[in-house]
């Protein structure tokens, strides 16, 4: 059928888009706008998955103005359809097809049945189960949180859930090293992407961390980011195309943007929804002279709605630098540094009062006064009395209630999340081993002896350069046949994956992984507990990054750190400074870089020449460093904000969230569904044992391509712990693209839309006709409203007997399905032709019955949306009265969303999605 502008067409692959209208044509493509979803698609004419929508005389037509009428006649003029329709005022009016409502109900299932496109009964069962799972996953509070390839760490899940559910979140993630800020940012981002709150994301990082972020986003979150640099952008200059509009997920370096201001203009015009900046503490700011980098990020933060800044802890930053980060997030709230300082000073006594509450101490009169001043609108006297009572349960309840009220009013608690190792359980100890050698060249011999002595252990060795790692591998292989994997920045991501997998293999893998310091960025090896620093990192931050490859949450054993170096060499003195001055081998040292800068001149002498400082001078340096460290440590401890830590940690709620995901991990429901899905689609499965399988495409699949399935096959696991140890395996969860897109493949395609089966039942007359009808209630609305959380596509099952009675509640789906047998294709086609009249009558009966079942679902969705959105609006309005960090714009957006959501839910409709005709026989 020829295309014409103004014609109405339906997408066969994306039914939820509603009825589209052709807006543009050229020789090869057709452009269709879908008003209901506010989406545009461009299709190749030759293979467009589109169906022309033509209504017939006697059918009901829905006008975009909201009324319906019976079609009296249809005329075709130059490819466009004109309908003569009886409107509600009983007038005959002409309706052009462009005026038809974009929200359309259709029943392709019936068309497929009567055109002999009939599937097996097992395909129908897969479709129904898929629809049920789709509904459950849209409603799940775990959606967007459970699919990360990471251990279930409560504080990370709490931050991801808290921030991810917000509208346009703007927050500072300031956890201590090793607590997973990158994972938190990725989980927040994934949550927002799943909810379709954001679609275009820009991540700005230091140049050395670009690949780390690329790897983390891909391996942990299945997010495919593109790295942008000058070379990539140059490719688009001749075409006058803004390169930043060619990808939705982009990573680039801060230094590159600083040195190429013309690219910054392109970024500003690319309409990103979300900005993530790592190492944000390096953005230098003062009231009189902010740095170029700071001003650059400030420009972006002004126009990009969602902003996540990953930074050092506020104590490390200093108050002025901390204010500068907050100013990027909310310049209206944090407009003046001196005002901010006064607010912080005023708040410190409240923090002290919280320390008393947490320590179960009696509150002093001064502490009570400070709490009362902050909670003016709340009568706190009864809580004070309860705390002073002898009833332990009442005491604890009152203390928790006071703490929660103070958290809600925390000066920056809604914008700032900061966890410390002291506040988070699960860290092992670090044990330092100084290995003193006679000569520098003895290091290789020592390493060989060490590996032979620890043959049953996994050893992680970090060298300064890739060349050293490569040479060591050759020496170990040739001299002692020691199995070693190499890991460095010159390898591709796939090559690094293979090396990591070889090292992770407990049975036949490498004993040792030889890595350059840059090459290991973004990779963690908690299954190993022995670290050899073949070359010492050049500064404390790099040292912490190296140790942090093993010393992370999830490490089950104490981490052994070995540093081999020649006696009295520059390396040995640097090791002593790290150990005796900073204690950086056995503990994290937040003040390490500050002390490194303070003693930079002396350390330069140490590193360049072991005799540049006498032993007395060097001992003096160690004492000075230790004294300065202890002084800084006391200051940092004084500045700890326990209230902020409580808010960041999430407490019992965070643990409950982790437990919920763990329970789902252990449920067989996903495994059963996925294996059945692969089986019916025609994907080959090979069981490898140890909770993993290889899935491969075949030439007999029901679809030409299965999402995420490579030609050479993919190894997958449903086991979180195995996925953490074996990065080359895909970790399948309900959130994995392969499962989500597999569900979409079935739900939006034709698999199982019409089926027929035989029921052997001696108690029913032979030839008795039953029909199973699956309707779907849905709202065709803009993605940003996230109406799927209130009204996901919801299946309604009817099972009609030959008299039109719904017996679905009496006969469960799985019970019935287990008793059905397949019918041959020829018999199926003959039976459908013979019973067509009865089938059509039963479908019409189903259309009548479903209304009374669908309307309460829509009403409940509206009620739920109203209650949930109103509750959040009321909560934020109440908090805004006592906490300036609640943005009015956030409340305004929520109010608009509530109005629009209720309006769109009022337009929700239902459609017949699939059907199964069942014929009985005695045998």
From Swiss-Prot:
A motif (DEAH box) lies at residues 278-281. Its EC number is 3.6.4.-. ATP binds at residues 175-182. One of its GO terms (biological process) is DNA repair. It holds the Pfam family SNF2-rel_dom. Gene3D superfamilies: 2.30.30.140, 2.30.30.930, 3.30.360.80, 6.10.140.1500, 6.10.140.2230, P-loop containing nucleotide triphosphate hydrolases (3.40.50.300), Tandem AAA-ATPase domain (3.40.50.10810). InterPro entries: Helicase_ATP-bd (IPR014001), Helicase_C-like (IPR001650), Helicase_RapA (IPR023949), P-loop_NTPase (IPR027417), RapA_C (IPR022737), SNF2-like_sf (IPR038718), SNF2/RAD54-like_C (IPR049730), SNF2_N (IPR000330). It comes from the Bacteria. GO terms for molecular function: ATP binding; DNA binding; helicase activity; hydrolase activity, acting on acid anhydrides. Transcription regulator that activates transcription by stimulating RNA polymerase (RNAP) recycling in case of stress conditions such as supercoiled DNA or high salt concentrations. Probably acts by releasing the RNAP, when it is trapped or immobilized on tightly supercoiled DNA. Does not activate transcription on linear DNA. Probably not involved in DNA repair. This is RNA polymerase-associated protein RapA. NCBIfam families: PRK04914.1. Residues 162-332 form the Helicase ATP-binding domain. The keyword Nucleotide-binding applies. It is an enzyme of class 3 (hydrolase). Transmembrane segments: none annotated. Interacts with the RNAP. Has a higher affinity for the core RNAP than for the holoenzyme. Its ATPase activity is stimulated by binding to RNAP. The keyword Oxidoreductase does not apply. Belongs to the SNF2/RAD54 helicase family. RapA subfamily. Keywords: Activator, ATP-binding, DNA-binding, Helicase, Hydrolase, Nucleotide-binding, Transcription, Transcription regulation.
């Amino acid at each position: 059928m020829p295309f014409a502008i103004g014609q109405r067409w339906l997408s066969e692959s994306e039914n939820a888009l509603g009825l589209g209208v052709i807006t543009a044509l050229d020789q090869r493509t057709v452009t269709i706008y879908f008003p209901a979803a506010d989406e545009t698609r461009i299709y190749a004419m030759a293979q467009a998955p589109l169906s022309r929508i033509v209504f017939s005389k006697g059918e009901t037509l829905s006008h975009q103005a909201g009324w319906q009428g019976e079609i009296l006649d249809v005329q075709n003029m130059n490819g466009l359809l004109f309908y003569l329709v009886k409107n509600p005022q009983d007038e005959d009016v002409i309706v052009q097809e462009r005026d038809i409502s974009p929200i359309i109900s259709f029943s392709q299932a019936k068309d497929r049945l009567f055109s002999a496109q009939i599937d097996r009964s097992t395909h129908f069962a897969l479709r129904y189960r898929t629809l049920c799972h789709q509904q459950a996953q849209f409603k799940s509070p775990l959606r967007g949180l459970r699919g990360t390839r990471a251990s279930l760490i409560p504080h990370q899940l709490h931050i991801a859930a808290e921030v991810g559910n917000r509208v346009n979140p703007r927050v500072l993630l300031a956890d201590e090293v090793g607590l997973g800020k990158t994972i938190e940012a990725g989980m927040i981002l994934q949550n927002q992407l799943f909810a379709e709150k954001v679609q275009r994301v820009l991540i700005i990082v230091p140049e050395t961390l670009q690949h780390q972020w690329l790897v983390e986003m891909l391996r942990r979150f299945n997010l495919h980011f593109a790295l942008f640099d000058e070379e990539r952008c140059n490719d688009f200059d001749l075409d006058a195309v803004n390169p930043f509009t060619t990808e939705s997920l982009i990573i680039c370096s801060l230094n590159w943007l600083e040195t190429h201001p013309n690219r910054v203009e392109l970024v500003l015009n690319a309409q990103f929804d979300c900005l993530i900046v790592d190492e944000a503490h390096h953005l230098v700011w003062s009231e009189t002279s902010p740095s170029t980098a700071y001003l650059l990020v400030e420009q972006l933060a002004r126009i990009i709605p969602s902003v996540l800044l990953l930074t050092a802890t506020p104590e490390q930053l200093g108050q002025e630098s901390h204010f500068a980060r907050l100013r990027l997030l909310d310049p209206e709230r944090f407009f003046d540094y001196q005002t901010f300082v006064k607010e912080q000073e005023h708040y410190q006594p409240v923090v002290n009062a919280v320390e008393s509450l947490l320590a179960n101490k009696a509150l002093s009169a001064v502490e009570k006064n400070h709490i009362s001043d902050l909670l003016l609108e709340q009568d706190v006297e009864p809580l004070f009395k309860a705390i002073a009572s002898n009833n332990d349960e009442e005491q604890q309840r009152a203390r928790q209630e006071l703490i929660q009220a103070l958290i809600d009013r925390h000066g920056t608690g809604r914008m700032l999340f900061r966890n410390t190792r002291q506040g988070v359980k699960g860290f092992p100890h670090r044990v330092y081993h100084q290995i003193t050698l006679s000569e520098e060249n003895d290091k290789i011999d020592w390493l060989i002896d060490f590996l032979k002595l620890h043959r049953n252990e996994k050893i992680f060795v970090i060298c300064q350069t890739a060349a050293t790692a490569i040479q060591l591998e050759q020496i170990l292989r040739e001299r002692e046949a020691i199995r070693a994997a190499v890991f460095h920045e010159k390898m591709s991501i796939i090559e690094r994956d293979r090396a990591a997998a070889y090292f992770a293999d407990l049975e036949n893998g490498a004993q040792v992984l030889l890595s350059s310091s840059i090459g290991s960025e973004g990779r963690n090896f908690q299954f190993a507990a022995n670290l050899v620093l073949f070359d010492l990192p050049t500064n404390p931050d790099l040292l912490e990054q190296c140790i942090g490859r093993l010393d992370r949450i999830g490490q089950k054993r104490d981490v052994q750190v070995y540093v081999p170096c020649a006696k009295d060499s520059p390396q040995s003195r640097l090791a002593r400074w790290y150990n005796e001055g900073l204690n950086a081998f056995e503990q994290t040292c937040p003040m390490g870089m500050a002390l490194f800068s303070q003693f930079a001149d002396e350390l330069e002498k140490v590193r360049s020449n072991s005799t540049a400082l006498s032993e007395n001078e060097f001992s003096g340096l160690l004492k000075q460093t230790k004294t300065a460290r202890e002084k800084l440590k006391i200051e940092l401890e004084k500045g700890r904000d326990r209230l902020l830590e409580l808010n960041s940690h999430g407490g019992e709620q965070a643990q409950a969230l982790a437990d919920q995901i763990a329970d789902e991990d252990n449920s067989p429901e996903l495994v059963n569904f996925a294996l059945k899905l692969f089986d019916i689609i025609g994907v080959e499965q090979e069981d490898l044992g140890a909770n993993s399988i290889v899935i491969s495409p075949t030439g007999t699949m029901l679809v030409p391509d299965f999402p995420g399935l490579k030609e050479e096959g993919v190894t997958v696991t449903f086991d979180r712990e195995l996925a953490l140890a074996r990065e080359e395996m895909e970790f399948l969860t309900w959130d994995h693209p392969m499962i989500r897109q597999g569900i979409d493949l079935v739900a939006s395609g034709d698999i199982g839309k019409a089926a027929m089966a035989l029921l052997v039942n001696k108690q029913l007359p032979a030839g008795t006709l039953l029909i199973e009808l699956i309707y779907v209630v849905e709202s065709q609305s803009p993605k940003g409203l996230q109406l799927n959380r209130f009204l996901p596509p919801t299946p309604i099952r009817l099972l009609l007997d030959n008299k039109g009675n719904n017996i679905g509640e009496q006969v469960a789906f799985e019970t019935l399905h287990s008793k059905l047998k397949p019918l041959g294709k020829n018999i199926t086609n003959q039976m459908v032709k013979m019973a067509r009249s009865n089938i059509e009558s039963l479908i019409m009966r189903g259309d009548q019955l479903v209304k009374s079942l669908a309307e309460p679902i829509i009403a409940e969705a509206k009620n739920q949306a109203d209650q949930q959105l109103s509750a959040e609006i009321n909560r934020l309005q109440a908090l805004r009265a006592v906490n300036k960090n609640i943005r009015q714009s956030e409340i305004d957006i929520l109010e608009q969303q509530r109005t629009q959501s209720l309006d769109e839910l009022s337009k929700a409709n239902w459609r017949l999605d699939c059907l199964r005709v069942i014929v009985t026989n005695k045998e």
